[in-house]
Amino acid sequence: MRILVFLWLGLSSLFAVDATLEVVKKFANMPSIIVEDSSTREVERGLTLRVYKMLVGDLKVSSHFNVQEGGASSFDMVMDYGAYRQKKVDLVAKVKAGREGSGILAELRLYDVNSGDSVFAKSYTVAREDRYPFVAHKMAIDINNYIKAPSIDWMNRFVVLSKYTAPSESQIVVADYTLTFQNVIIKDGRLNIFPKWANEQQDAIYYTKYLTKPTLFRYNLYTGESRKITESEGMLVASDVSADGKKLLLTMAPHTQSDIFLFDTQTGTRKQLTRYPGIDVSAHFIEDERRIMFISDRLGYPNVFATGLDGSETVEQMVFHGRNNNAASAFGQYIVYSSRESSNEFDTNTFNLYLVSTKSDYIRRLTANGVNQMPRFSQDGETVMYLKHNGAQSALGVIRLNYNKSYLFPLPSGKIQSMDW
């Protein structure tokens, strides 16, 4: 796992630290865990090492553990709890993995040093060897659940992204959050952009393909079927999907300038929600899908606004900091957005992420430099994923909001156009 780690700007947090306190209460301090390699056969060691390294990385990203890397220790060895206590270790995780057909069978045994007990022994299988990161992600989630820490279930979700492979050509890729696992699902020599998960199950996506007109397709990951949904002049992007999967928020430009439309996937009908003679893009459902948040240049520069679903065009400004806020995501009363902070005519501009509350004037900067765009909240609101660009290269960034830490996972080659998780 390739990780670049940064301390978050500032030591205070807009989000509550109750979650951290619950973990500390159970173990007196942040629990210390040591991960050990329990492979016994040479043929197991390479695969076990990959799962082991990924698990160590996952536990660090969770921010709920002090993580140590241990040596070899088979399942058959008698546990010397006293020796671990002297090293101030609270938990021991023993891992091994082997091939089973074309897939993997892995095992995890967790020991609680303080109680002197074997906590659990679990087996994990995946059908393909290249999916081994998800074995480690599931292990990390189970260990995290044992200490009753806030959920890290987001680690086991797929990320879908579009990456450029040549001029006017891009692929759609499904990956894990570290970009270690990658599976190309759309590759046809065309421009395929703006993938969006179609449902909570993550078994289908919407994406835009540039044909004679921008055309929206729905692709089923399990059957490989692509079905045309609609097309439009100018531009066409599916920016959000309702919880029941029946409604889409589309950015369309049927008459030169882009506006926001509500599309019914059952009937194929659409309703225009904005009619501004400028640019309205990137809408997202907010407030239990009673309203939408979107980006508009109606102040003379891009900013974040909200309006209802009734098409009344009554618009509310949501963000009052920054003069070029071009992307946003919402969770409850919080908005995370990307703001341009430089005006370089001949060089790359700086875009930083900010977190604000709609209930107060509190604001926090989440990134310090570079090009940071397309922020996305996790389902529990505790984590933000975003894109970081550096020249022709890209990385997925993960910010753990409660713990003042962020992580970068570089894409080995190519540049990410957009992503969803």
UniProtKB/Swiss-Prot annotation:
One of its GO terms (cellular component) is periplasmic space. It comes from the Bacteria. Residues 1-16 form the signal peptide. Pfam families: TolB_N. InterPro entries: 6-blade_b-propeller_TolB-like (IPR011042), Tol-Pal_TolB (IPR014167), TolB_N (IPR007195). Keywords: Cell cycle, Cell division, Periplasm, Signal. It is found in: Periplasm. GO terms for biological process: cell division; protein import. Belongs to the TolB family. HAMAP family: TolB. The Tol-Pal system is composed of five core proteins: the inner membrane proteins TolA, TolQ and TolR, the periplasmic protein TolB and the outer membrane protein Pal. They form a network linking the inner and outer membranes and the peptidoglycan layer. Part of the Tol-Pal system, which plays a role in outer membrane invagination during cell division and is important for maintaining outer membrane integrity. This is Tol-Pal system protein TolB.
